[in-house]
């Protein structure tokens, strides 16, 4: 067993006379030259067979002059002396592993390694690994591409040695990595992926507003807005068809507030529908205003005067604010052709805040001459408002003369079109002109 471990031993005996000088040097009790310890590794220490108890003299092995003394300043503690019973005159050039009774002492730096074995020729001195990849063993040129034939990937060949380097900060954009090469002017350039501008565009748009920015962008699309408007109009049409009374509730609201100078539903409903159709949302209410002219105005001037007087009477009485926009409707008769009379409605809008005043007229409805003459005959000669018209309206005459005819809506009996529809058409045209003249912030 001892021979297998590489230690030459002899039975204990009296040293020969030729080695007397050596035995004197062996009188020391400590080993002068420390033997390299065995580092902790999975390999187990060689097992020695038990030997009989003999005196364990200490000996020192002369170190050749060519061997440098160990550099480690950390003393090693041995559990026991080597089981050697004798000394030899020739120096033993074999390394003997020794067992430690304590853990391996920590090395102060990566460059501290165990001393080389005691051979005639000193072993190579180990140094720290290089900080740059080794380039020896192969030649490089500026025209050689190491990525050729690897589909853009780094080749797994000895040309790309594995080495460890300091952590590299990850940059947001692709960069060109260059490995420094000593003694060469060329560099290794990795392929750089082109930057996609769409990625930054999407990122900027997403960070600007997130999900709300996306919704805002979709809602601002003209095509999407048109589809939404059509859908809204379709839903409102279905609701108002099933229940016509719901129209005023659906479209009531917004910044547009209009007062109609009448409490008659035929006028208020027509103006409400017209302004809500043009502005989308509008609040339209009615107040009873007085015209202060004859009940049946005659001529354009009288009709316009009656409509304006209704607005002024409401403002004088304080029923509406002086700056309140108002719409007034006044019907009159006029002889447009010889012995041909027509009923016409005058519709005006007055907005003192923005200085807007507009007029519009409904379509002319023919009135038979005999009914006009009856209205003139029922009016006294000394009537104080004779300058503005007649004291009896054409509707009252028609109601007396014809069955199933109403004084307020006799137009449908003569034309098939109701008075409300006529006022609605004129009011819608008036609302369109009014909208064009309003500042954008009101809309």
From Swiss-Prot:
Gene3D superfamilies: 3.90.950.10. The keyword Cytoplasm applies. Signal peptide: none annotated. It comes from the Eukaryota. It is found in: Golgi apparatus; Cytoplasm. InterPro entries: ITPase-like_fam (IPR029001), NTPase/PRRC1 (IPR026533), PRRC1 (IPR026534). One of its GO terms (molecular function) is protein kinase A regulatory subunit binding. Residues 1-25, 106-129 are annotated as: Disordered. Belongs to the PRRC1 family. May act as a regulator of the protein kinase A (PKA) during embryonic development. This is Protein PRRC1.
């Amino acid at each position: 067993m001892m021979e297998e471990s590489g230690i030459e031993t002899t039975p204990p005996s009296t040293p020969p006379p030729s080695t007397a000088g050596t035995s004197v040097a062996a009188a020391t009790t400590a080993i002068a030259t420390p033997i390299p310890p065995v580092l902790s590794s999975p390999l187990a220490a060689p097992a020695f067979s038990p030997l009989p108890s003999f005196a364990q003299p200490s000996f020192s092995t002369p170190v050749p002059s060519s061997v440098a003394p160990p550099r480690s300043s950390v003393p090693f503690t041995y559990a026991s002396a080597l089981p050697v019973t004798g000394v030899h005159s020739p120096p033993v050039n074999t390394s003997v592993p020794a067992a430690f009774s304590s853990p391996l002492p920590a090395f102060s730096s990566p460059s501290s390694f165990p001393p080389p074995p005691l051979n005639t020729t000193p072993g190579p001195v180990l140094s720290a690994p290089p900080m740059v990849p080794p380039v020896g063993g192969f030649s490089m040129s500026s025209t050689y591409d190491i990525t050729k034939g690897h589909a853009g990937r780094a080749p797994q060949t000895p040309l790309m040695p594995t080495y460890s380097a300091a952590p590299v900060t990850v940059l947001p954009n692709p960069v060109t990595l260059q490995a420094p090469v000593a003694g060469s002017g060329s560099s290794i350039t990795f392929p750089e992926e082109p930057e996609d501008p769409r990625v930054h565009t999407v990122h900027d748009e997403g960070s600007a507003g997130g999900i709300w920015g996306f919704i805002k962008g979709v809602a601002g699309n003209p095509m999407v807005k048109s589809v939404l408007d059509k859908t809204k109009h379709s839903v409102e049409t279905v609701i108002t068809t099933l229940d016509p009374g719901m129209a005023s509730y659906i479209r009531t609201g917004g910044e547009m507030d209009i007062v109609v100078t009448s409490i008659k539903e035929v006028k208020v409903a027509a103006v409400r529908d017209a302004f809500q159709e043009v502005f989308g949302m509008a609040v339209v209410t009615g107040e009873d205003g007085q015209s202060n002219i004859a009940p049946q105005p005659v001529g354009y001037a009288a009709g316009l005067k009656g409509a304006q007087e209704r607005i002024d009477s409401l403002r004088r009485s304080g029923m509406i604010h002086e700056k309140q926009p108002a719409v007034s409707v006044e019907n009159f008769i006029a002889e447009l052709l010889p012995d041909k009379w027509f009923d016409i409605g005058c519709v005006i809008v007055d907005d003192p805040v923005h200085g807007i005043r507009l007029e519009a007229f409904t379509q002319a409805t023919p009135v038979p001459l005999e009914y006009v003459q009856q209205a003139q005959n029922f009016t006294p000669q000394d009537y104080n408002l004779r300058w503005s018209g007649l004291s009896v309206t054409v509707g009252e005459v028609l109601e007396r003369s014809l069955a199933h005819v109403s004084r307020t809506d006799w137009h449908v009996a003569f034309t098939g079109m109701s008075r409300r529809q006529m006022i609605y058409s004129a009011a819608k045209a008036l609302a369109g002109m009014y909208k064009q003249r309003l500042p954008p912030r009101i809309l």
